[in-house]
Amino acid sequence: MRLILLGPPGAGKGTQATFITQTYGIPQISTGDMLRAAVKAGTPLGIEAKKVMDAGGLMPDEIIIGLVKDRLAQPDCANGYLFDGYPRTIPQADALKDAGVKLDYVIEIAVPDEDIVKRMSGRWVHLASGRSYNTQSNPPKVAGQDDITGEALIQRDDDREETVRHRLGIYQQQTRPLVDYYSSWAAQDPANAPKYRKISGVGSVEEIKARAAAALQS
């Protein structure tokens, strides 16, 4: 099983990625993890990547695709892999295609923007314990207070509504075009393209898991 998960921030990709990798016994391939591992190991690509990171630059696609190819050659990828947060742009998708990286499925988890805003901006945390709450799905017993200690809850900057809307805007500009890229490729060249499946990310975790499982059987 070789696949890409697509969807906006807050769509629940992480939860479904864990479910799929455990179900199929495949690794989750994260470009961030690959970069850190290559830099730590001092590989030729890692040395190049470190220079870019130290200069505060954007990582060139050639370095990323080189890391991807190295990672996919490792034994744990023999039965498949799940890409986490990659590709993010059309040039990255083209690089993956040109490198001959095999894919069976591209799964899009679709959630309306307003649902994402409610879901993410409703998150509040108790810093000392790490306990988290959501005003929509898991509210504290007393608004703004931790259930155990009664101490104040805080909202992380990443979860503020304006930040969430900004991240959704970046997703719509950069990553959303991948939905069209993979769906049109699947329609035009079904023999070679990965199967494109769209599932709703609205509902309980178990409902979405069932949709993901069904999509990977279809």
UniProtKB/Swiss-Prot annotation:
GO biological process: one example: AMP salvage
Give the span(s) annotated as LID: 122-159
Which annotated residues bind AMP? Answer: 31, 36, 57-59, 85-88, 92, 156, 167
- Keyword ATP-binding assigned: yes
Gene Ontology molecular functions: adenylate kinase activity; ATP binding
Identify the metabolic or biological route this protein is part of. Purine metabolism; AMP biosynthesis via salvage pathway; AMP from ADP: step 1/1
The answer to whether UniProt assigns keyword Cell inner membrane to this entry is no
Region annotated NMP, chain positions:
30-59
Which Pfam families does this one have?
Answer: ADK, ADK_lid
Q: What top-level class of enzyme does the UniProt entry assign?
A: transferase
Q: Which Gene3D superfamilies match?
A: P-loop containing nucleotide triphosphate hydrolases
Keywords, A to Z, come to: ATP-binding, Cytoplasm, Kinase, Nucleotide biosynthesis, Nucleotide-binding, Transferase
Q: Where in the cell is it found?
A: Cytoplasm
A cellular component term from Gene Ontology for this protein is: cytoplasm
The positions annotated for binding ATP are 10-15, 123, 132-133, 203
**Source species, domain of life:** Bacteria
Q: How does it assemble?
A: Monomer.
Q: Which HAMAP family does the protein's record reference?
A: Adenylate_kinase_Adk
State the family it belongs to.
Answer: Belongs to the adenylate kinase family.
According to UniProt, the name of this protein is Adenylate kinase
Species this protein is from: Bordetella avium (strain 197N)
